[in-house]
């Protein structure tokens, strides 16, 4: 019984790691600010570039205020965002 439970836990851990490694990342840029969002993960990284310098600040933030896919398409149609 313990072997079965151990095997099930190991299998679940492997599946979670595979899912995390297959996350699809997308980079959105607008006016010297870029956001990299990886689906399958709960965080984004925000890159801010100061005008005239090459310093880039990166920080992680919660994606609770992230636009939905429909909103992203609307923004893409307006030409506001550049997808790399």
UniProtKB/Swiss-Prot annotation:
It is found in: Secreted. It comes from the Eukaryota. GO terms for biological process: defense response to bacterium; defense response to fungus; innate immune response; killing of cells of another organism. Keywords: Amidation, Antibiotic, Antimicrobial, Cleavage on pair of basic residues, Cytolysis, Disulfide bond, Fungicide, Hemolysis, Immunity, Innate immunity, Pyrrolidone carboxylic acid, Secreted, Signal. Residues 1-23 form the signal peptide. Residues 42-84 form a propeptide. This is Gomesin. It comes from Acanthoscurria gomesiana.
């Amino acid at each position: 019984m313990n072997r079965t439970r151990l095997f099930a836990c190991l299998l679940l851990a492997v599946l979670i790691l595979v899912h995390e490694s297959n996350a699809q990342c997308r980079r959105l840029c607008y006016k010297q600010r870029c956001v990299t969002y990886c689906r399958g993960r709960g965080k984004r990284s925000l890159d801010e570039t100061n005008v005239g310098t090459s310093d880039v600040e990166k920080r992680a933030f919660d994606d609770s205020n992230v636009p939905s896919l429909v909103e992203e398409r609307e923004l893409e149609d307006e030409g506001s965002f550049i997808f790399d």
